Amino acid sequence: WELDPRTDTDGLEAAAALCRSAGYWALPYPVAERLAKPVDLDTDGLLVIGGRRPAAAVAGLSARWTAVTLDGVRSEVTGQGPAGTEFVTELQLAQRDTDGAADVALGLVLPCWTLLGMLDRAIELTVAHVSLRKQFGQTLSSFQGVQFQLTDAEVERSGLDMLAKYALWSVGERRPEALHDALALLAAALEAAEIVFRVCHQLHGAVGFCDETT
């Protein structure tokens, strides 16, 4: 956690690479949120939240969290509600200040790098699966329909990769448009994830629902 992504360009790139690796290995820990912590507060991590029923995937973690809205209102997380699915819990907040506008862009961009790592891994596993699995005496990868689906997924992944690099550069340069770039990246990441995960799930067939290795 000694990386300094807010004031050091090398630290910013290293933080993005670390988040991508965490996503690739499906690490069940909010690495991006820890790395995005504000430099002017004594806190362990930053959570970008919505205005109504704020929640985050930090259930069971006892770290000191700071939450920030898109308009820069920062709050201290004083408690958590019951843990829901995927480690998500509602947050109890105490407003701290309204000085968090500069914190938001990085808090949005780094989690997108985590999601990008997940897409990297999903496509890698799917390519390996269709190259091994056979139907009608041929590997799945030899069928044109499968190739088209994988191409669509890779186009989404590679497009997100380029946009993530641009948004990271925008944050590092402290451009006035950095927040807009971060929001565009977030929207693109969610759209790409829907397509990539759907394709990968479909091409894994029943393996997507059960363990066929035993």
Where are these regions (language model features)?
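Alpha-helical interface subdomain recognition
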Residues: 1-25, 108-214
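FAD-binding core of flavoproteins
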Residues: 24-124, 128
